[in-house]
Amino acid sequence: MNTLIAITGLGIFCLLFEILNFRKGIVPFTILGLLGVLALNFYEFGTTASYYNNMITVSKFSTAFSSLFIILTIFLVALSHNFYENHQTKISDFIAIKVFLLAGAVAMVSFGNLAMFFLGIEILSIALYVLAASDRLNIKSNEAGMKYFLMGSFASGIILFGICLIYGAMGTFDIAEIHESSLSAELPIWFPIGMILMTIGMFFKIAAVPFHFWAPDVYEGSPALTTALMSTLAKVVAIATLFKLVSGLNLIPSLENQDLSNTFTNVILTISIASMTVGNIMALRQVNVKRMLAFSGISHAGFMLMTFLTIATSAGVLLYYTAAYALAGIAAFSVILYVCKNQDNEDITNFHGLGKTNPLLAAILTGSLLSMGGIPIFSGFFAKLFLFNQALHAGYVAIVIAAVINSIISVGYYFKLILAMYSKEPNEERTGKPFLIYAVAIISIGLNIALGLFPSLVLDLLN
């Protein structure tokens, strides 16, 4: 709760910086403020409490994921300094939106009431709609903002309809009361229907197949920094929230009918395999790097959904996987922001010869792509290893085989970009070494490797 209040206060201070004309100091001030919020969040780790009639609940799950969200936001704010250098008059607005977006993200994993859950989703979503369309003179950005707004509105409507059905079945929005009522023998049919509608709405948010069709166009059309935010922070928030929703509302045990329970498991299996396969196959044919990473994100959503098959014991694995994926994504987009800063697009041709003109950033991008592909020593490899091991122990052999095949396929399009950096001649000489871009890229890939070398640091937090 203190974390949420501190984040909201920091967002208000960011808006005041615009009024007081302190724009030059807003990025370092916000980073220092977020580091203070992170320390406060660490201090609360291990405590369990509820606030405002259980509207907000603090637990290890919420604190651990909130820490990850804060770290990712620090990186994104740091990247804003160079990205918005030509829009200095608006930089405080963009920074404040990111901080308020973080408040929505923390609320989404700290909810104890469905009203707070929906409020968190809307805070996050509205901030993303604005950021997607923030390049107002770019028609692709306008199109991305409109598409994202329409699809997000439909998803929010479906979620709200599900919440209404759950309220009709249980007579309360409180998660603890719903959980307790779901253990009873007599359970209204509206409850599983409402839960299924909420799950479908969240599948839109994480861009899982077949609810993924908005992602490639929105990722490609949005400003590169917004795409980085969507593919890392927003996706991780949505999958963590869905995990808490399904486990907190006791959906799977509440399906007393064995056929219903098996149906839910089969749906998760189908969507997981479909997301992995469609995402990887479509990524193979992409020449735009942002669009390629959009399909890669769809594929990773399929991998993350595998944790729902063993939901009682997989919170630690989900935290580890999301951390590994998000850190690799931040490192990759740091390099993309540097390479494509003055370009009209983010095509692979822009990366030709990067290994010769800037070996350090080429190595960082290579490392982040190898992590996403599941190559050791990066944490992406161990994330998939722990995920597959858990699924095998639960008896889900078929999905593990499909996941391994898809991991092999993904290496194909990652190496397409890697080969372009090292085997092609550079198109142009790039000058300048922006400190914050280099710092974010080095620290994020360093943290990714550290998680691979010491996985227990994250895995044991929620086990």
UniProtKB/Swiss-Prot annotation:
Membrane topology per record: Multi-pass membrane protein
Keywords: Cell inner membrane, Cell membrane, Membrane, NAD, Quinone, Translocase, Transmembrane, Transmembrane helix, Transport
Catalytic activity: a quinone + NADH + 5 H(+)(in) = a quinol + NAD(+) + 4 H(+)(out)
Top EC class, one word: translocase
Record has Transport as a keyword: yes
Compartments where found: Cell inner membrane
Transmembrane segments: 2-22, 25-45, 61-81, 91-110, 114-133, 149-169, 189-209, 223-243, 264-284, 292-312, 317-337, 362-382, 395-415, 434-454
GO BP, one annotated term: ATP synthesis coupled electron transport
Chief site of localization: membrane
InterPro entries from the UniProt entry: NADH-Q_OxRdtase_suN/2, ND/Mrp_TM
GO CC, any one term: plasma membrane
Taxonomic superkingdom: Bacteria
Tagged with keyword Transmembrane: yes
UniProt EC number: 7.1.1.-
Classification via Pfam families: Proton_antipo_M (PF00361)
Molecular functions per Gene Ontology: NADH dehydrogenase (ubiquinone) activity; NADH:ubiquinone reductase (non-electrogenic) activity; quinone binding
PANTHER family: NADH DEHYDROGENASE (PTHR22773)
Oligomeric form and interacting partners: NDH-1 is composed of 14 different subunits. Subunits NuoA, H, J, K, L, M, N constitute the membrane sector of the complex.
UniProt xrefs under NCBIfam families: NDH_I_N
Biological role stated in the UniProt entry: NDH-1 shuttles electrons from NADH, via FMN and iron-sulfur (Fe-S) centers, to quinones in the respiratory chain. The immediate electron acceptor for the enzyme in this species is believed to be a menaquinone. Couples the redox reaction to proton translocation (for every two electrons transferred, four hydrogen ions are translocated across the cytoplasmic membrane), and thus conserves the redox energy in a proton gradient.
Family: Belongs to the complex I subunit 2 family.
Record protein name field: NADH-quinone oxidoreductase subunit N
Species annotation: Flavobacterium johnsoniae (strain ATCC 17061 / DSM 2064 / JCM 8514 / BCRC 14874 / CCUG 350202 / NBRC 14942 / NCIMB 11054 / UW101)
